[in-house]
Amino acid sequence: MQASAPVSSKKHKQQEDRVKRDDSLGTSPNIPSAACRTALLQLLQSALWGRAPQEQAFQGLTRADWQSIFLTAQAQTVMALAFQAFEFLPDELLPDDALLTRWMVQTEQAEQHSRHMNDALASLCEFFTTRGLQPVVLKGQSIARLYRHPLARECGDIDLHFSIHGQAAQALCALRDAGVHPQPKPDGSYLYSWQDVPVEHHPRFTDLASPFARRRLSGMLSRFPSQSVALGMGTHAQIMVPEPTVSLFIQSTHILKHAMGWGIGLRQMADLAVSLHSEHSRIDGRSYKRVCSQAHILQWNGLLHGFLTQCLGLPLQQLPYADRLFDSQPLQERVWRDGNFGLLHTTRIASQSSWRSKCRTAVSMLRHARFGWTYAPAETLFTALQLMAGQFSTGALHTDDHNE
């Protein structure tokens, strides 16, 4: 369905202006320059859509600029994806040979890691299916297969959900019988390693904090059943993935959770853009809008869709429904300042204690409360209630995800 041109109501324009004042890009030393941000976005658009980038974005870039672009792409986990755009750039606009070689080597390493991830995923799915179980692969490789260069989509862990009643418990029993011992988390999920790849079993397929919205959406999987698809990427595996409308909802709420917390990165934005581009003809836009309305995230979608069209070049007609798009600047600030799950944030320390991590997560969410109230007030309310109750590790609050 053709989307309307970007427009914002007066009320939300005022709200956006307040968010912009609170989230100034100039307050963090980690933010790349405007020229570097523009160049990286041009590389991503080129890699995503298979077209030449705008050459003027790369004219005049210094060696230091290219180094900043490379490091930012690393932190945003889009380094290998951005590398795919160099085939469209003339030699005189490419980075210097030393950096280009480093970029190429690390891209090859990322692609090799993706191959290992695919082998592990294929093996794990076979382990479960031979026992009569049907794991659904959430995010990650279920989306990587949609990319023009699937192996260039940098991966982290395997996320699974068992939607058939009783199968989640059966899966844990099967793993224990095989000598694998999943570790429980406070939100009801389980973590373990399979062929040196971290795996997480999720009790729910959404990241919604509101219990009322979760109840209203409990029948979503039955209305939109998961489907079997070819994993591809050099494998012969078949995997179960969410139906495209469900996948879209999962991604939108997942990005929202992290945008309200430590931060979100360009890779998750690219995932959503690729999903819409590849499967827009199969997405039930009317049903998707109704589900998002029930979850009270239509305003959030307006901001998110604005980012996809304004920053990643997604065509308006590939949005799931005609949308009132907001200026994406507030979301851009969250992406550029904090990066992929907050990896750019100077106060985030990987080795911090569990208690300290929870406190920092709470502080981070409180820092961005105005952002949440502007675009997803219901989710922000229930997130705040959980914080007040001290449940820092619930499904909606837990932000120490692996890199998916």
Where are these regions (language model features)?
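Conserved NTP-donor binding/palm subdomain of two-metal-ion nucleotidyltransferases/polymerases, i.e.
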Residues: 2, 7-16, 20-156, 162-404
